[in-house]
């Protein structure tokens, strides 16, 4: 049976942080807050057609999510960043939605992890 991978590799994240669940919880909580703000800003940047603002947001999400082992979100943000570099408005809209969908999964995973930990 195929199992869907978690949006966050908690084992790798815990290993990187010496198994300290309090640090992981703190980092993920801050990330979830920033992600909510960044996603709202990214939606506004799409509406405004502001490719540079959207690229900066995608770049920030790409790096932070990679550091926190949320690799599918990081990949989606990387694709959005590339679309912004190409200034392809329709592709930016699509990639922003893909990134938002991945971010929703990450936020749900963080909330579930908080409840279970």
PLM segments and residue spans:
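Two-component system phosphorelay core
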Residues: 1-117
């Amino acid at each position: 049976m195929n199992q869907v991978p978690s949006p966050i590799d908690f084992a790798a994240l815990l290993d990187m942080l010496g198994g300290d669940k309090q640090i992981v919880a703190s980092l993920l909580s801050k990330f979830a807050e920033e992600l909510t703000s960044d996603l709202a800003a990214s939606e506004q940047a799409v509406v405004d057609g502001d490719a540079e603002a959207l690229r900066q947001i995608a770049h920030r999400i790409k790096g932070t999510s990679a550091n926190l082992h949320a690799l599918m979100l990081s990949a989606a943000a990387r694709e959005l960043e590339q679309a912004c570099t190409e200034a392809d408005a329709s592709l930016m809209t699509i990639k922003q939605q893909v990134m938002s969908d991945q971010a929703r999964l990450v936020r749900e995973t963080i909330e579930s992890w908080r409840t279970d930990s």
